[in-house]
Amino acid sequence: LGCGTGTMTEKLADYGYDMIGVDNSEDMLELAMEKRMESGKDILYLLQDMREFELYGTVRAIVSVCDSVNYITEPEELEEVFRLVNNYLDPKGVFLFDFNTVYKYKEVMGDTVIAEDRGECSFIWDNFYYEEEQINEYDLTLFIQEDGSEDLYRRYQETHYQRGYTLEEMKELVERSGLVFEAAYDAVTHEEPTEKSERIYIVAREFGK
């Protein structure tokens, strides 16, 4: 879910899994399908909003990484995403996802500016954190080098909104959706999350619909 340009989808396909990628960005899926053509993998991509996604049947596992769920800024809508996940999982199927925490947006990223020069691509990342709503707005300005030119860069601008969640909030949403909450891990230490965990992995499971 939220497969983006298909990088993780391709990696999982490398391990022999049959993959379906779901994303609501045509541009992202276009890049994903270019990667599919290069690799020759049999991956099905679907242009769908994860809040309303539909599959042709149930699957053994659903994965959502790279803070895709943080783009769902209303808890009620995220609960509905989890209900759909539960609906499309095989009996006792597993759901793996990650999310950025309130701590990360408030204490690490909030109201900061990040700038980086990577040669062919440079960016300025300007963050604004709204504490009451737990929402982080970031304005991203990209400078991407044009093919065949050393001096010409094209500028692109994007604005994104992501909501931070606490582990307690996320656990409640998972359980209210009908899924069974199994485990949580700090994304860096792979141990039990702490108050200062910035990204958390969640393992949940279908257990009867």
Give residue spans per PLM region.
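Class I SAM-dependent methyltransferase "Motif I" SAM/SAH-binding loop
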Residues: 2-4
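Class I SAM-dependent methyltransferase SAM/SAH-binding core
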Residues: 7-52
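A short acidic, Gly/Pro-enriched loop at the edge of an enzyme's catalytic core
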Residues: 54-61
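Residues lining the SAM
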Residues: 65-67
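A short His-aromatic
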Residues: 70-72
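A short glycine-rich, Lys/Arg-flanked "PGG" loop and its adjoining helix->strand segment in the class I
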Residues: 79-91
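SAM-dependent methyltransferase
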Residues: 96-171
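C-terminal lobe and adjacent flexible extensions of AdoMet/dcAdoMet transferase-like proteins
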Residues: 161-209
